[in-house]
Structures are given as structure tokens and as C-alpha cells.
């Protein structure tokens, strides 16, 4: 009887020792991961380039195009996102210049009717709805004097002067882009009581989260 009690006690102590040894390991692992994330944040992201080298500078500065000529509104107020190959073909049915990337685009996409699989920098989660119509020049310029480019650049990367699209950083865990809008960015305007008074808008969660 005593031997059995001793055996049970030994087993209990063994289990306690095993747990006691594992706890510091897991705590150390968590600390190491958090420190690594803080010290080397880029390790969380994979870097990808766009399938076609697209020059906003040529289209915006040289050709005088505006954002809305390629990024138009849907009926629900959201942007249609990226232009289709058909819309690009309105100007690029044939090669216009000497850029080899344009020649490749015409050959691989325009002639075949294939869509370019552009990497979206600010693709939002499915539970987030953002109305571009509600954030238009007509609304913001009741008080401000933004140009279209200035208004877009409040949320989007300023690429008008770039000959190449920025590198796309994709989160290895979530699949979302590093540039996906964060709530603190929205709060720059939505936490301002003066904005709410002028626009009669609401900060209720369901306005943006569906």
C-alpha cells in the first residue's frame, strides 16, 4: 500500500517537473518571436513585384491622365479597382513607344485578351466596406481644397511620379498587403468631431464593418 502511494507521489512530482520545464521554454519562445517581429518586421512579409512594370509618371505627368480615368466608381460607390485589359487597349491596341514592357503587355495581354493579375496594395478584408463616393472631392472640399491627386494620396501611395510600381509586401500569415488600411489611418479624419458635424456622418461600427 505504501509502495503504491509512493509511486503515485513520484508520478505526480514527475508531471509537475515536466510542466515546470516546459513553461519557461514556451515563455522564451513567445518572447523570442515578439522580439524578432519587433526587431525584424520585414521578415513577416514576402516581397513581390507587379507582373508588368507600369509607369504612372508616363500616364499622369506626361499624358495628363487623372486617377478616375483608370480607377472608376461602381454603382455602389466603391471603386472598380484596377483597369481591365480592354480599357488599356483603347490606347494600347498597338505598341506606342519603345518600352519593351509595353511591347510585352500588348503581346501577352492585349492580343490574347488576358487580364493582368495586378497585386492590390490596399485590398480590404471581406467584412470592411469603404465607399469612395462618400469620400469624394465634393464632400471633403466643403472645407478643404484638395486636388484629386491630393485626396487620393491621403489613403493611397503617391505613385504619380514613379516609373515603377512599388514593391508589394504580402503578410505571410494573413495574405494581406502591408499597405492595407489600418483603423488608425481612418481615425485621422473620423475621430475629428469637426468632420462629423459638417458631413453628418456616423462613426458607428456597422457603417464600415458589415
UniProtKB/Swiss-Prot annotation:
GO terms for biological process: anaerobic respiration. Heme 3 binds at residues 140, 143-144. The keyword Cell division does not apply. The keyword Plastid does not apply. Its main location: membrane. It holds the Pfam family Cytochrom_CIII. It comes from the Bacteria. It is a single-pass membrane protein. Its EC number is 1.97.-.-. Heme 4 binds at residues 152, 155-156. It is found in: Cell inner membrane. One of its GO terms (cellular component) is plasma membrane. It is an enzyme of class 1 (oxidoreductase). Heme 2 binds at residues 88, 91-92. The chain crosses the membrane at residues 20-40. Heme 5 binds at residues 186, 189-190. Its cofactor is heme c. Keywords: Cell inner membrane, Cell membrane, Electron transport, Heme, Iron, Membrane, Metal-binding, Oxidoreductase, Sulfate respiration, Transmembrane, Transmembrane helix, Transport. GO terms for molecular function: electron transfer activity; heme binding; metal ion binding; oxidoreductase activity. Gene3D superfamilies: Cytochrome C3 (3.90.10.10). Heme 1 binds at residues 67, 70-71. Binds 6 heme c groups covalently per subunit. The Qrc complex is composed of four subunits: QrcA, QrcB, QrcC and QrcD. Can form a supercomplex with the [NiFe] hydrogenase HynA1 and the tetraheme Type I cytochrome c3 TpIc(3), its physiological electron donors. Belongs to the multiheme cytochrome c family. Component of the respiratory Qrc complex, that catalyzes the reduction of the menaquinone pool using electrons transferred from the reduced periplasmic cytochrome c3, and which is probably involved in sulfate respiration. Is likely essential for growth on H(2) or formate since the periplasmic hydrogenases and/or formate dehydrogenases act as primary electron donors for the Qrc complex. This is Menaquinone reductase, multiheme cytochrome c subunit.
